[in-house]
């Protein structure tokens, strides 16, 4: 057996110049985020209220992933959360939102009131939650005070010192 991806016994980090907590191992790959609704099939116009919605996110390189739901109740952080507390995800790995393969997914995503709903996922090279305004560090899966829509969400992230280091994707659907 060989250990793959573990820190060598000699101490240092396995990737040169990698800072602790950084998403390394896929340098040189342009980061993209793919986000899609899995159960909105051809011919369907949208979801009925209370119908479950399932999404999949995928990043092209190792990244810290933060996903937010925007609906009639406001904007809330879906990932990371109490069940999936780590923001670091591997490149090209399907992240299910919610994790419908888990017996305890942490939450169920249901269409709310008629209108447009969306999930926005942001991928970064390093953890950023501690750098965001205090309201973002509150309990996940609860409306974030003062953040009314996706524009407010993105504006808060633009305030980071190196705001050009995040990539985003959004998936929208209509609640009928």
Residue ranges of model-derived segments:
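Secretory-pathway glycoprotein ectodomains that are cysteine- and/or Ser/Thr/Pro-rich
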Residues: 1-176
């Amino acid at each position: 057996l060989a250990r793959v991806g573990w820190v060598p016994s000699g101490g240092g980090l396995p990737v040169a110049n990698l800072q602790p907590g950084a998403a390394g191992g896929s340098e040189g790959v342009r980061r993209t985020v793919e986000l899609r609704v899995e159960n909105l099939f051809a011919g369907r116009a949208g979801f009925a209220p209370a119908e479950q919605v399932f999404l999949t996110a995928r990043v092209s390189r190792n990244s810290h992933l933060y996903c937010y739901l925007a609906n009639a109740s406001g904007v809330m952080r879906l990932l990371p959360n109490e069940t999936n507390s780590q923001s670091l995800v591997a490149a090209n790995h399907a992240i299910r939102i919610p994790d419908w393969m888990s017996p305890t997914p942490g939450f169920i995503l249901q269409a709310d009131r008629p209108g447009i709903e969306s999930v926005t996922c942001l991928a970064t090279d390093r953890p950023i939650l501690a750098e965001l305004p205090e309201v973002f560090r509150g309990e996940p899966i609860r409306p974030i005070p003062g953040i009314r829509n996706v524009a407010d969400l993105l504006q808060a992230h633009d305030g980071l010192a190196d705001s050009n280091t995040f990539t985003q994707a959004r998936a929208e659907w209509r609640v009928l």
